[in-house]
Amino acid sequence: MDEIMNKELALVEVDSISDALSTFIEQGTETVINVFTSNEAAVIWEAVTEVSADLVKASKVVTVIKKAASIPDKLFMNKMEKYCRGLIEIPANKRKKYAAKVGKPGLNKDSVFILGVLNKIEELSKIKILLTLFEAKIDGLIDDETYRRLMLLVDRTMYSDLLYLKANITDEPIVIENDAEQGLLANGWLYYYGQTWGTATEDSQLVYHYTNIAKQFCQLIEIE
């Protein structure tokens, strides 16, 4: 059994997983996701005729990796599965139109970046946010640079701090008063604005503003 698995793993190239995600972005459906997350996916695919050869290949790559995965790899595959399940909620015609626009190289570039972020995030709750940002990019609401910047900001910010950001975003200057605001400042959602005048009874205080990208994030994202 180990010998068979080693031979299967030898067929999985370094970029196979990004190719698989690119295929799911373009062609993924609920049936596809249910099959590729099954332990018997490679067998089930043999009886499925209404999917493309690319999808069959993508599913088998994922299946092989899942079988041989270490615990950290299994955690990563769990994040990828959750991402793919959310991905199919984006209308298929929208995904296919985007795929046609950027081509396979563009999809692969997206996939490599997404996988890098998924590999680092520790809170599964963030995955819904990542999907919302990807759909916003597909819809042309944000450009690629803004999309990537927001993805990286989300990656390094605690989910509870993102909840705080959404609930407390303001155009007014603020004084840092709690750990959430300190976290948002440290991770680039706030910038230094100036200092208040001190009085006989009160010391001067440093004040900060939410960044434009923080405001843009809050316009795009619904967090429950």
Set out the residue ranges of the language-model regions:
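Membrane-inserting effector segments that mediate pore formation, membrane fusion
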Residues: N6-Y83
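A sequence-composition feature that detects small, non-aromatic residues
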Residues: A10, A20, A41-A42, A47, ...
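Amphipathic, membrane-active segments
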Residues: K60-V117
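Generic surface-pattern signal
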Residues: E26, E30, T37, K57, ...
